[in-house]
Amino acid sequence: MPQPSPSTDAAHRLIVGGGDSELDSRLSKELDAYNFAAVGESNLEEFTVKVEDTDGQLVAGLSGWTWGTCAGIGMVWVREDSRKEGWGGRMLEATEQLARERGCRQLLVSSFTFQAPDFYRRHGYTEFARSEGLPIEDAADVHFVKAL
């Protein structure tokens, strides 16, 4: 159960807790409203790309967003027994095509060094930033961009 913080005052409570999907949804809504007002673009759209086997089981999936002239990939996963079969590349191609159709000129994605940075490089993505020591000492969070 979340506990009030010692910094509580008469009018407010600071509460530290675990994951909260309701709070996440509210924060997203509030930030979207602020961002849309700031830049004059409100065409943020989420998308997904997935691969299923003949039994309807998930083989691979990708989720992301488009907004204005930019697209971003949030998550990519390929089932272990289906890796090295080209599904990741096909999902990237489908994502890039969708982003172009929505008027995007660039696509952003991040990958930890123990995940798939070389995969993105092979598909034409360029590293533009790197944060060392994340999420562990011997790893890094690598940020990529691809011009569409």
Would you name each region that the model predicts?
Residues 82, 86-94:
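Conserved acetyl-CoA pyrophosphate-binding loop and the N-cap/start of the following alpha-helix
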Residues 91, 115-116:
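Conserved short alpha-helix immediately C-terminal to the canonical SAM/SAH-binding motif I
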Residues 108-110, 126-143:
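Conserved catalytic-core motifs of GNAT/GCN5-like acyltransferases
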Residues 12-74, 79, 114, 131-133, ...:
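Acetyl-CoA-dependent GNAT
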Residues 27, 120, 125:
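Conserved active-site tyrosine of GNAT-family acetyltransferases
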Residues 99-113:
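Conserved GNAT acetyl-CoA-binding A-motif
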